[in-house]
Curated annotation (Swiss-Prot):
Gene source species: Bos taurus (Bovine)
Alphabetically ordered keywords of this record: Acetylation, Cytoplasm, GTP-binding, Hydrolase, Initiation factor, Nucleotide-binding, Phosphoprotein, Protein biosynthesis
Known role: Member of the eIF2 complex that functions in the early steps of protein synthesis by forming a ternary complex with GTP and initiator tRNA. This complex binds to a 40S ribosomal subunit, followed by mRNA binding to form the 43S pre-initiation complex (43S PIC). Junction of the 60S ribosomal subunit to form the 80S initiation complex is preceded by hydrolysis of the GTP bound to eIF2 and release of an eIF2-GDP binary complex. In order for eIF2 to recycle and catalyze another round of initiation, the GDP bound to eIF2 must exchange with GTP by way of a reaction catalyzed by eIF-2B.
GO BP annotations listed: cytoplasmic translational initiation; formation of translation preinitiation complex; translational initiation
Gene name per UniProt: EIF2S3
Protein name: Eukaryotic translation initiation factor 2 subunit 3
Gene3D superfamilies for the chain: P-loop containing nucleotide triphosphate hydrolases (3.40.50.300), Translation factors (2.40.30.10)
Length: 472
């Protein structure tokens, strides 16, 4: 880690310097220059039906291909959550017409560069640094999407121009946005290069009818072609103008939800060269700093001799912080942050830490094994049609002892319904989870071999377990 000890970022000299010695957390904002120079501060989800071009749009804006895994490339679908950061610039020459004065680049681009548009002068200046959470668009992966949605400030809803609207998953995703209370939505009518103008207009009417009465009502509809990069600068302009910068809490104790974790050591590495595990996630609040002592809950879960669950939180120290390829001295909420720790790498490999919560020592919430929730069920199963019937299948009521999949933060775990009333339920979780009263959870049930979203709930109270701590 170059320069990690001195508390000053030495990597990427063309970006704004971060110095821990002069850091005053109370003065930071999501648009502070030294923050957005190196990391994203706004999370935007891309949602929509499979193969409508979500990953392509992200690639057109950020230059990053979010599909990272071999099986995803072969099938051309996104399975895990993909993240990509993009910097949005605005030209400081007032004579340049909109939308040409907006531009997007990758996250390692300098904060200012001269214009290359003929007839204009001045520089492109950094105005926003956004992170795109590329959500998988398949039914089975609805859970992953709700997990990703825990850290979304706004959404781009993609609708392909060459198919009728709405496709089944489009409505399912819109329901997920409503659950997550996302208010800021841009609708992108993609693949516009494949259809005639009359078709595009006809579909525009369909989209208007489809979003009426939902959170997306009144959202701007922008026709684009992600492959040909048509109108991408309009999308950039709308991101800057229509999506307000979310209010962030920089002064609380930091908390990060782990979405990915990995072991960065190559096989055959010498013992002295071993590096600690890396956890990737989005910070909900507070600021993480290099050198800070951290705690990870629930930590290592095991059972004692009587078969009772035990949790042993992991204590460690941050040795490095990254946002894509930019190294940081401190990380603020927004975007995917990689946290290099001194945790045993075997605990982190292959996403083993997903669903855990990382934060300042002693400031993390309780660990729950049972939850009492107030819940709401959807009236109909989204996207599932019953045989011979045009309408979607009805959602059956919760029954005692049935097993559901519960999504809390980034954790998906099984839960058995132990008691149920009109709108209250008790759920015994298979895995303990670190969460708080008032948090939202999503409920899915197995329907025809797939997990389908059936509703959501809010935690009222629950049974907590005391974490065990070694005496040494």
């Amino acid at each position: 880690m170059a320069g990690g000890e001195a508390g000053v970022t030495l990597g990427q000299p063309h970006l704004s310097r971060q110095d821990l010695a002069t850091l005053d957390v109370s003065k930071l904002t999501p648009l502070s220059h030294e923050v957005i120079s190196r990391q994203a501060t706004i999370n935007i989800g891309t949602i929509g039906h499979v193969a409508h071009g979500k990953s392509t749009v992200v690639k057109a804006i950020s230059g990053v291909h979010t599909v990272r895994f071999k099986n995803e490339l072969e099938r051309n679908i996104t399975i895990k959550l993909g993240y990509a950061n993009a910097k949005i610039y605005k030209l400081d020459d007032p004579s340049c017409p909109r939308p040409e004065c907006y531009r997007s680049c990758g996250s390692s681009t300098p904060d200012e560069f001269p214009t290359d548009i003929p007839g204009t002068k001045g520089n492109f200046k950094l105005v926003r640094h956004v992170s795109f959470v590329d959500c998988p668009g398949h039914d089975i992966l609805m859970a992953t999407m709700l997990n990703g949605a825990a850290v979304m400030d706004a959404a781009l809803l993609l609708i392909a121009g060459n198919e009728s609207c709405p496709q089944p998953q489009t409505s399912e995703h819109l329901a997920a946005i409503e659950i997550m209370k996302l208010k800021h939505i841009l609708i992108l009518q993609n693949k516009i290069d494949l259809v005639k103008e009359s078709q595009a207009k006809e579909q525009y009417e369909q989209i208007l009818a489809f979003v009426q009465g939902t959170v997306a009502e009144g959202a701007p509809i922008i026709p684009i072609s992600a492959q040909l990069k048509y109108n991408i600068e309009v999308v950039c302009e709308y991101i800057v103008k229509k999506i307000p910068v979310p209010p962030r809490d920089f002064t609380s104790e930091p908390r990060l939800i782990v979405i990915r974790s990995f072991d960065v050591n190559k096989p055959g590495c010498e013992v002295d060269d071993l590096k600690g595990g890396v956890a990737g996630g989005s910070i909900l609040k507070g600021v993480l700093k290099v050198g800070q002592e951290i705690e990870v809950r629930p930590g290592i879960v095991s059972k004692d001799s009587e078969g009772k669950l035990m949790c042993k939180p992991i204590f460690s120290k941050i040795v490095s912080l990254f946002a894509e390829h930019n190294d940081l001295q401190y990380a603020a909420p927004g975007g995917l942050i990689g946290v290099g720790t001194k945790i045993d790498p075997t605990l982190c490999r292959a996403d083993r830490m997903v669903g855990q919560v990382l934060g300042a020592v002693g400031a993390l919430p309780e660990i729950f094994t049972e939850l009492e929730i107030s819940y709401f069920l959807l009236r109909r199963l989204l996207g599932v049609r019953t045989e011979g019937d045009k309408k979607a299948a009805k959602v059956q009521k919760l029954s005692k002892n049935e097993v559901l999949m519960v999504n809390i933060g980034s954790l998906s775990t099984g839960g058995r319904v132990s008691a149920v009333k009109a709108d209250l339920g008790k759920i015994v979780l298979t895995n303990p989870v670190c969460t708080e009263v008032g948090e939202k959870i999503a409920l899915s049930r197995r329907v025809e071999k797939h997990w389908r979203l059936i509703g959501w709930g809010q935690i009222r109270r629950g049974v907590t377990i005391k974490p065990t701590v070694d005496d040494d």
